[in-house]
Amino acid sequence: MSEVALLVVDDSSFNRLMLKRRLAEQGYNDVTMANDGVQALAAIAARRFDCVLLDLEMPELDGIGVLERLREDPTHAPPVIVISALTEMQKIVRCIELGAEDYLPKSFDPPLLRARLGAVLEKKRLRDLADERLRLLEAELESARTAQLSLVPRDFATIAPPGLTIAAAMIPARQVGGDLYEAMRLPGGGVLLCVADVSGKGAPAGLTMARTLGAIRAAARLVPGPLPDPAAILAHANADLAADNESQTFVTAALIVLDAATGEGRICVAGHEAPYLLDAEPPRVLAGFARQPPLGAWEGFAYASCALTLAPGQGLFLYSDGVSEAEDSAQSFFGRGRLEAMLAPVALASPAAVVEATLAAVATFVDGAAQTDDITVLVIRRG
């Protein structure tokens, strides 16, 4: 058991030597000694210990004082077994409240020492194993997040046809998110724009996000015409997502196909937030869409699109509900009212400035509160 590092803290040299002998008899040879709490904290700062056997009554700094200091940084604190007389039960209870794993009477009974120290070391081993698995999982999820973010476009200067400017951002609530956006140059001189939101969270939603993005890109190439109908594109994607959808995973989407030269295009909304029109007037939601189900919810559904015209200087703001439903610590929503108030002063700004203002406004509102939904914004403006 030489790999187990122990620290014995007691102001009595007799107790220290007796406990060290008891530990050696049980195979624990890597034992460091400390006379009081101050020395103990210095030893703990200098190296890693698997367990600390800590006396309660000591000069300089007693056992309770040591535990209070260790509690300030519990992630690096070793397990502690308190050494105490049975008459000090109230202090023992206080030590347990401060994080001590167990206590040991000063008789240092060998069977009891073996049982309690063994139990504490086993719990530490299991915790260390769980921590390592969590670390590996977090590293894998971070790699998945990086891979996922690499799927969506970022170089909008090469995507946007002449006369159009595009910007977008996506912030997963977890390492892997279910939102997506797409900005795709079409062979006929137009552009495809899409924001979508997968039901569910985490890795399953991330996999569906990648599948949906692939289906939309493939459908955009399959649908005939220089400006493929967004309804036909979403119908193709729906056929893929609705088939054998045992997990009941759905994807809301808003998809626009726009001719850069004329500003004429079409839009199809499948259970998603309608885009905002940005111009000199107050921001307003595009209207006139038929209510249509999310992708994956209704196999064979005949999606319909509506005509859309974007005049010079006008812009479109597409977003996921992670923006309007962002929550602060009081669980209040950011809401459409705040969104519209935020958009009003930047309605004529560049798409990049609108995206930046949106993310800044949401971040200010939530003020560090953890979010449960992804946040995605895409803005296009006709020059």
Q: Each predicted region: which residue ranges?
A:
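Two-component/phosphorelay signaling modules centered on CheY-like receiver
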Residues: 13-32
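Acidic catalytic/metal-coordinating carboxylates
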Residues: 14, 35-39, 57, 62-68, ...
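Acidic, metal-coordinating helix/loop segments flanking the phosphotransfer/catalytic sites
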Residues: 33-51
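A Lys-centered signature of the CheY-like receiver
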Residues: 104-106
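… and, occasionally, acidic/histidine-rich disordered N-termini of signaling adaptors
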Residues: 131-315, 367-383
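C-terminal catalytic subdomain
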Residues: 234, 254, 306-318, 323-383
